[in-house]
């Protein structure tokens, strides 16, 4: 089965910036080699408690406030080139659907904080390994204070389509900036996949020509 017609859509995103200050505790792990009785070497890790303050600026944390497109492959075709955004111009949207957000600014910020928390956890673990010159970091617990919080409401270009294979409908999306494809495909549906790649190629060609 071939894909249905592609629909050009401008989808809404919230982006958030914030300065973060996190007080943390954790454990720094130091590896050492110990020779066993049979002559082989074994790695053992010694742990010591650590604590500190980590500061980091979070830039352009994106939240897609569109419930309608959450299963269409849009998340899988991220990221978008946010540095290429231009000021709002109705002429650019002419001929395309521009979807309105369904998740408000406040709820979007709550979602963004979940993303920020995961990024901070990884950053703090890296900070511990660098600052204490250890091999591992574990048991990180932290609390974060946010300041200088700003946001933007943006629209990003996406091509949406779907195809039917063995009585099941599969949706997918194409990033209108990069041509990256997102979505799930059935196993062994080679003709369908080739058709998708053909249409993606056409879109990419149009993008580069314009």
Model region roles, listed by residue range:
Residues 184-195:
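Juxtamembrane/start-of-transmembrane alpha-helix segments at the extracytoplasmic/lumenal side
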């Amino acid at each position: 089965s071939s894909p249905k017609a592609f629909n050009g859509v401008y989808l809404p995103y919230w982006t958030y910036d914030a300065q973060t200050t996190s007080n943390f505790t954790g454990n720094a792990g130091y590896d050492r080699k110990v020779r066993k009785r049979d002559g082989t070497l074994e790695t053992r890790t010694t742990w010591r408690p650590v604590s500190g303050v980590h500061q980091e600026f979070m830039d352009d944390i994106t939240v897609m406030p569109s419930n309608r497109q959450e299963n269409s492959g849009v998340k899988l075709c991220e990221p978008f080139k946010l540095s290429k955004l231009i000021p709002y111009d109705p002429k650019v949207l002419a001929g395309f659907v521009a979807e309105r957000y369904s998740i408000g600014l406040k709820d979007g910020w709550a979602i963004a904080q979940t993303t920020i928390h995961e990024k901070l956890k990884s950053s703090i673990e890296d900070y511990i390994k660098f600052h204490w010159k250890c091999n591992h970091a574990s048991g990180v617990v932290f609390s974060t204070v946010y300041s200088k919080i700003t946001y933007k409401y943006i629209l990003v270009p996406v091509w949406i389509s779907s195809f039917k294979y063995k009585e099941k409908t599969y949706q997918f999306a194409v990033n209108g900036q990069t041509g990256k494809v997102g979505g799930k495909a059935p196993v062994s549906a080679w003709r369908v996949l080739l058709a998708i790649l053909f249409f993606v190629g056409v879109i990419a060609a149009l993008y580069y020509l314009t």
